[in-house]
């Protein structure tokens, strides 16, 4: 289960999305709709610290969500675009984590020494410009963000212009990482926490600035 997946929420309609101003205006006017909106993470959002949001409506809460006029209007506009292709209140694929999501950009600059990755909590949606592991073991962060993994990326990854295109099939699944003991995993996890602590010290900097 420790495999990166593409769970891209792709749609031609912008009506399911909110920029930061739209989000703040929406929850100010309708505080109750906050439970139907999630932070939306893509490559640029993750790397540059851009806040974008999306409606997250499961079948179980659909009727309740549509009692709100703002949501009802956005769903109606999306329905006009989608016609009868798929539900107008959901993305192409909706997968949820129990605790955390480990996210990596699908495209990363050739000038980076490490792949910039990040943990997000379970109340996060992702778009098609990233791939993710849902509920990973913490040591996976250390492996994927290591220098040796970056060497592998440079060797086997596809390219978008000159930048690296990270994929589960070509890069992650083929990475020749040996079986390790629980003690070794715990040591890697200690180092992961050191990295995360160092990031926290530079919390004003984006991942793009740090990497």
PLM regions and their residue ranges:
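Polybasic, glycine- and aromatic-enriched phosphate-binding surface used to engage nucleic acids
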Residues: 1-187
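Extended amphipathic alpha-helical segments enriched in small hydrophobics
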Residues: 171-211
